[in-house]
Amino acid sequence: MNNGSGRYLLTPPDDLHPYVPSSKPQEQVYPDFKPWEHTAAEDQILANFVAKGFYHTPMVNFESISARSSVHESLVTQSNILSQQFDKIIKIREDHINKIPSNSTTTLHGPGFQLPNRITLTDHRKETWLHELSSSHTSLVKIGKFIPHGLKRRQVIEQCYLKFIPLKRAIWLIKCCYFIEWKSNHKKKRSNAAGADDAISMHLLKDWTDTFVYILEKLIFDMTNHYNDSQQLRTWKRQISYFLKLLGNCYSLRLINKEIFHHWLVEFINKMENFEFLPLSLHILMIFWNDICQIDTNAPVAATITSSQKEPFFLVTKITDMLLHKYYIVSSSKSMINDENYIINDIKKNNKIKLNILKILSSLILKIFQEQSLEVFIFPTSNWEIYKPLLFEIVSNADTNQNSDMKKKLELISYRNESLKNNSSIRNVIMSASNANDFQLTIVTCKQFPKLSCIQLNCIDTQFTKLLDDNPTEFDWPTYVDQNPLTMHKIIQLILWSIHPSRQFDHYESNQLVAKLLLLRINSTDEDLHEFQIEDAIWSLVFQLAKNFSAQKRVVSYMMPSLYRLLNILITYGIIKVPTYIRKLISSGLLYLQDSNDKFVHVQLLINLKISPLMKSQYNMVLRNVMEYDVKFYEIFNFDQLVEITEQIKMRILSNDITNLQLSKTPLSIKIMVAEWYLSHLCSGILSSVNRTVLLKIFKIFCIDLEVFHHFFKWIEFIVYHQLLSDIESLEALMDILLCYQKLFSQFINDHILFTKTFIFIYKKVLKEKDVPAYNVTSFMPFWKFFMKNFPFVLKVDNDLRIELQSVYNDEKLKTEKLKNDKSEVLKVYSMINNSNQAVGQTWNFPEVFQVNIRFLLHNSEIIDTNTSKQFQKARNNVMLLIATNLKEYNKFMSIFLKRKDFTNKNLIQLISLKLLTFEVTQNVLGLEYIIRLLPINLENNDGSYGLFLKYHKEQFIKSNFEKILLTCYELEKKYHGNECEINYYEILLKILITYGSSPKLLATSTKIIMLLLNDSVENSSNILEDILYYSTCPSETDLNDIPLGSGQPDNDTVVTNDDKSDDDDHTVDEIDHVEYYVMMDFANLWVFQAFTCFCIKKIMENNEPAMAMEDLKNFIFQIIEITNSNDLCSQIFDQLKDMQTIEMITQIVEKDFCTSCLQNNNQKIDDNYIVVVIEIITSLSMRFQRETSGMIVISMENYHLLIKIIRQLSELNEGNLSKREIQIDAVLKIFSFHQDSIFQRIIADLSADKPTSPFIDSICKLFDKISFNLRLKLFLYEILSSLKSFAIYSSTIDAPAFHTSGKVELPKKLLNLPPFQVSSFVKETKLHSGDYGEEEDADQEESFSLNLGIGIVEIAHENEQKWLIYDKKDHKYVCTFSMEPYHFISNYNTKYTDDMATGSNDTTAFNDSCVNLSLFDARFERKNPH
């Protein structure tokens, strides 16, 4: 309309009217999208907008623009968007039409579609055809009419990636070749049988999949072949990139078998050991991740999830295990690159590669953790121990907002794996309920056994004790502490183990091991236990030991010297502090109590601790406080007196007056001050060479007189790094020291790599030319073997050290072989040893050299001057040359020498210490009886000879012949019993047994010998047991090597042995029952009581009828439990039983007593300690039975029915009462799990026989429904129910006698409706009901049981496949369905639209799918909900 100003005022439409269904024609539809009907409204629009025109301020500088451009943007300006939308339309069209699917061989889509023909071409023309195919400039219509012969599977795929054929053309070629091959196979088979086409298709699909897999493997492994050629490497990168795209397209088009490919990919990565291929393999895995893990993005919406849920996919479980294993391998590996040109010192590059790989692995593991069922994280026990810390590390480092849910999942997984292990201790549950850091120490004495005393703790880890008793040099303690953090109870147990008298002789490293483990615990990431808490616990232990110090409790007095040494080591490392101890001592008020003897123990302890000058006043103040009770402490041991004594000892050392320092009564604090001064003195000033005499002299001062190994090893590092050793003899002496104290070598030497490299350098480069004769006859092979055996990890880290060790090892072998095969070399070495320049070929005489030098060595053992020392060494080298030349001949002469017996026992000990004779050779000639006489003998001049090698060789011989030696001692004791004999074989037997018998490797032999001693004289068995226990708590002052226990050793307490097997005490054997000895059982002598238990049980079983034996055995077991106050060691006393029938009988006895107690005390709570001991006994015996027989103990019928009654009673209780019986429920479920197979078989058998077993299952289900106060118990019950369901389904499919049923087994619905393992089933909050459940409430619970089992159904909305909706962005709602109608050409739609116009139809669905109106309305496909 003209408004008078020459302009038209046009009112544009408020909005574009959406398309509406044809059922509502009355609604306004915008023009240009529907034929006009010439209504009044349309005529008005025509008059206003078209006939009269439209005018508006132009948007550009010309006025010829159409009005349409203002309303709808032109296609030119929206070309990019239009092309994107059109591309999406074409993609959807290609997904449904115009394609050749691999899973359908009958529908070749499209009118007139026809496969190209195969023709025979020459190689040149075939190559030309392939080049044209790879060129995008050549029309596919031109070359696609035929395909050359000879292109099959591998050739097709190889040509595709070698010539980089465009992907669309490559897919066309592969599809054509695939279907041509299918048609050929179909014609050959000519089978009309049902399923024949499918069989052909599956076989063909497998062949093509194998071809893809073969080429992919080849391309991956070709990567390492192109490292040195950058051009080939670039080509390879293009090829692998292209092939992965081709593989992905063929995978999406189902031209390969997905299942076969998935399994291959997982297995391929799992078996891959080379880290260089891992990144690419993980990249390929991530490409196909969704399909492998069954993540379906197009899954239909499920309103409810019932039992039809997918079971955990096998590949997901396997890939989870594979990824965690790879994470473990990569994280523990030091080097990630195998390239020879790679320098291992490039730590930065190595760490970057390692972190990137770990990041990829952790991201994939997190995806599984967040998206998959938790069943995939259920692992075997061995794997779970490795994966558990890794899984915690990955989850804790995850950057996610759902930390609480992640922790719940992790907790659930951990509980489930722990429940499957069946070894979670109920005692730990009880300990966690109380203060886990509180420990109780009791020194037990008994009037019936006045000589005996033992140390008992409220919590003992017996496996930890076994580990400490074994303690191999190569054991990885850092990893152990990282995986098993030391609790306060373990720390106290560790300290008591290290200072216990029975562990002093064979565990010289115990004190240093304590310091090492405490430092590892303090520096660990676990902050549950702080350093100050550890120090408080140590001083608390010291106060408790001081409180129990008395003449009756001898074990404490014998522990004090070792306690002094341990505390000083801890002070050196800063773990504990003396000022803290003084403050605690003063604040305790013990110093001011007149009747307390504790103060004297504390003062004696303080005198032996390292005191710095800054603490002088505090130290003297403590001594003054006890002057009114004992003046000598202050007069003799005040700080000034300590300094004065220290200076006196220094002067004696400087004057070389060290023959007899007599420092056994000197306080350890003085020794430490002297040691620190002496170490500083040796390492300062002018450096001088060190020979064997000086080395052994300093060893005696530090390790024997001053009792400080730590300072001596510091000095060893100093002389090695400064290359101060003067000759091969001194280096050999150092080797003997390191081998003798090899466990200290691993702890005191800071850098094993540098030390060993320097040691090898001194041996090969410095002393080899300097001391040629000794080099040729001295073997260092034991040290090389020791290092390679005990430090394999070091050799992996440092390849140079490994090469050097291998080289020196081969040199040793070649040196020996040269002397054996080359007589001239022997004569040359012999001349150098004897300083003779003339040829001695005619004077070399093996017997003469042997006799002369052996005689000289035996008659000149006392080295007086330097000349004698040189002659002595020359004689030894001559004999060593004989050994290196012909060992077999040398042993013959030595055998003749031994048979003549023209020597004393000390002469033999001298030869053994000089490495000229071994215990093995002596045993072969003179017998083991003679060897036993030699064992107590040691060198008199131990400080200046080869006594250290004698000690080392003696220990090795005893351990390797442990059983033979003890049996021989036993037989000799019987032989000479009652006769006068200068050697006490019984005492030797006890010394060896106590010293080495607690080692786990020798425990079986120890049990055998103890039982032999007890069986030999049943009447005196009590005396024998007392002797063994006495030796283990109050040993003699020296061991078989005359090594003293240390300063502070009481003088008046020595070993008293019952040589005549009689007891001088007032009691007789009949007065003491064997059970009463168990009151003296502790963690240190547990191995003795294990043997004693075997003896007692054997005696019970042999002397009674079966019925009476069971009753006596029951009384024996529960008397032990009673007399030990339910000690946690009771469950371990049966560990050495060998008879499986006896183990099964004991298990049934203990189970019956427990079940009977539960039924009799239904209204009362059973003692928790009793439950714990009973279950630990059953657990220990069941696991032992399973290890030995690979089966499980079958539950007796009586115990089975008792178990049914107990579960029924528990199911009737309300949740409040159940929570009070948590320990009892746990015990019942553990018994159920131990006999799970036999119980399930009984249940299935009863169900098949129509016996009333369903109530039993209902009771378990009801109990599960009521328990919500403890996640661990709920998981335990769920595990039982799911296992029962699986067992029932499995047994119904197996036709075996064990599963044979007479009829069909019908399981209760509650069991059948058991859903898969879900987090929501166990993490939901459940309100605790008060009061008893009524009948109606119980009925409701039974009805809703299936819902409560599989709770937490999370409804996830998915978009329906092939369903699209048109969404109105302004109204925010869906207006209609977007129809998909396959078509071949866009002209088809024009034809259909013309037909609709002709018929007068108002259907606009055809245009609804056109690309034109999509672009006009800015429409697009989106796989998401716009809400």
From Swiss-Prot:
SMART domains in alphabetical order: Med12 (SM01281)
Note in the entry: Present with 1730 molecules/cell in log phase SD medium.
Organism: Saccharomyces cerevisiae (strain ATCC 204508 / S288c)
Domain of life according to the entry: Eukaryota
Keyword NADP attributed: no
Keyword Transcription: yes
Gene: SRB8
PANTHER family: MEDIATOR OF RNA POLYMERASE II TRANSCRIPTION SUBUNIT 12
Name the record gives this protein: Mediator of RNA polymerase II transcription subunit 12
